[in-house]
Amino acid sequence: MGYIAVVDYDMGNLHSVCKGLEKVGGNPLVTDQAHVIDGATAIVLPGVGSFDPAVQHLRARGLEEVLKTAIAKGIPFLGICLGSQLLFDSSEEGQETGLGIIPGQVKHFRSEPGLTIPHMGWNGLQFNQPDLCLWQDLPPEPQVYFVHSYYMAPLDPQVIAASTTHGSQTIAAAIAKDNVMAVQFHPEKSSTLGLKILANFVKKVALSDI
């Protein structure tokens, strides 16, 4: 049986992500080793914290190239929260360049009267890619859990898989292109609907591993 590499770079709540994957039948393996990531049937890049230290930690472990190579080979990939932002070229939060998998930038919410930043709590999703495997069997506008001050702003709006609105600002809540999927929210903290999203990812992994 293959395994899902959950990348450890000192920036993620790995326990809750692994617990969620295990609950839905996945076989997660926490690792910071390039050869382990290279042998995985899928990769999950979680993350909580700031952009620059995250990129620095990935590069210090020599993980940038193995992640890019795995993605180029078509390995199913799921980024979560900060892990989703690292796929982009850069962030307004820092000076480091990102992985550059998805062209675009990570931006900070604009201040507006009555708007709480960070965006923290439950919010509904609007599906831009309703047929994406992650959304299979979900209700319309499912409520998921967010904690973030920055958001993904891809150059190509076609890669936006779901959107959400905070104040007057509608932003990308998820992106998907080929084998790469990434969510700004925390599926592992989003109750039964979040577990369903993880289950859909695990199902895709199983199908791709046949």
From Swiss-Prot:
PROSITE patterns from the xrefs? GATASE_TYPE_1
Glutamine amidotransferase type-1 domain location is 3-210
State the protein's name. Answer: Imidazole glycerol phosphate synthase subunit HisH
TM segment ranges: none
Tell me the compartments it is located in. Answer: Cytoplasm
Question: What reaction does this catalyse?
Answer: 5-[(5-phospho-1-deoxy-D-ribulos-1-ylimino)methylamino]-1-(5-phospho-beta-D-ribosyl)imidazole-4-carboxamide + L-glutamine = D-erythro-1-(imidazol-4-yl)glycerol 3-phosphate + 5-amino-1-(5-phospho-beta-D-ribosyl)imidazole-4-carboxamide + L-glutamate + H(+); L-glutamine + H2O = L-glutamate + NH4(+)
Function in brief: IGPS catalyzes the conversion of PRFAR and glutamine to IGP, AICAR and glutamate. The HisH subunit catalyzes the hydrolysis of glutamine to glutamate and ammonia as part of the synthesis of IGP and AICAR. The resulting ammonia molecule is channeled to the active site of HisF.
- Keywords in UniProt for this one? Amino-acid biosynthesis, Cytoplasm, Glutamine amidotransferase, Histidine biosynthesis, Hydrolase, Lyase
Show the Gene3D superfamilies listed in the entry.
3.40.50.880
Q: Name one GO cellular component term.
A: cytoplasm
**What are its E.C. numbers?**
4.3.2.10, 3.5.1.2
Q: Name one GO biological process term.
A: L-histidine biosynthetic process
Any single GO molecular-function term of the entry would be:
glutaminase activity
Is the Lyase keyword given for this protein?
yes
The annotated subunit structure for this chain is: Heterodimer of HisH and HisF.
Q: Where is the active site?
A: 81, 186, 188
Pfam families membership:
GATase
InterPro entries in alphabetical order: Class_I_gatase-like, GATASE, Imidazole-glycPsynth_HisH
**Pathway participation:** Amino-acid biosynthesis; L-histidine biosynthesis; L-histidine from 5-phospho-alpha-D-ribose 1-diphosphate: step 5/9
